[in-house]
Amino acid sequence: QKELGKDKQMAKDAEPTFVGIRSDNELVAVNSCYYSNSKGIFNYWRSRGMWVHPNFRGQKYSSVILTWCLEYAKRKDGDWMWTVPRESALPAYKSVGFVQQSDWFEDGQYGPNCIASKYL
């Protein structure tokens, strides 16, 4: 059984939808979301790649993008959304209802990370 956040092939096979916010024609925030897998009766979606330009952080751009991704996944029959945020990004995810589901771990150059999820 593959665990959320540990299946590298899942991300390679994904067909993500990207969403961004522009200010004065400059991309200032971006994220992606995609269907990742089903387990039992639940369809899981992943949020991946949240980025907000440093000059625009702290202005709720991440909340707007995450809310859009959550609503999009729900319209596509998603039941849960999960993510592997770095420590500095977890507050943005919590602001829209994600709950930390794991301890912190090092997984590459952007850690520490954890697994967080939200029921749609």
Predicted regions and their residues:
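Conserved acetyl-CoA pyrophosphate-binding loop and the N-cap/start of the following alpha-helix
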Residues: F56-W68
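Conserved beta-strand in the GNAT
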Residues: G20, E26-S36, Y44-W51
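Short amphipathic alpha-helix that is part of the acyltransferase structural core
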Residues: Q1-V28
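A conserved beta-turn-beta hairpin within the catalytic core of GNAT-like acetyltransferases
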Residues: S36-R48, R57, Y110-P112
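Short alpha-helical
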Residues: E87-P91
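Conserved catalytic-core motifs of GNAT/GCN5-like acyltransferases
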Residues: V84, V99-S117
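Conserved GNAT acetyl-CoA-binding A-motif
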Residues: A73-R86
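Conserved active-site tyrosine of GNAT-family acetyltransferases
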Residues: Y93-K94, F98
